[in-house]
């Protein structure tokens, strides 16, 4: 990994509003997560996400854990990003990565760009030297395929 950001993109047949509605509903995140680590939405996930929203997720990567996420970038139907930190005692050891979705209207649908930004992550240097960036890139590509299926199911 050369920089601190990995991005994947896909043109999804559907409007930016349709895609954004899915992204802004944290309770739906487990349905399109391509990594298999997002298990269940927790606190704060029942309301539509907006700038400053805080929501929790139950996760599992080997062992179960929880994350707390805060929406830090928001432009309705164009951009949503949240920063993740560990829940409980993990908040002191992990966190800071940003998950960002940019939506651009194009002919035939919406160009969706998902980015994993570790520039502020506490484990940035560890991640950069591991296989996690390559695994994350593959997982993000799967997530975009699942988002496409979800949008086109309506």
Describe every region a protein language model picked out.
Residues 3, 64, 94-96:
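Short solvent-exposed loop/turn micro-motifs enriched in small/polar/acidic residues
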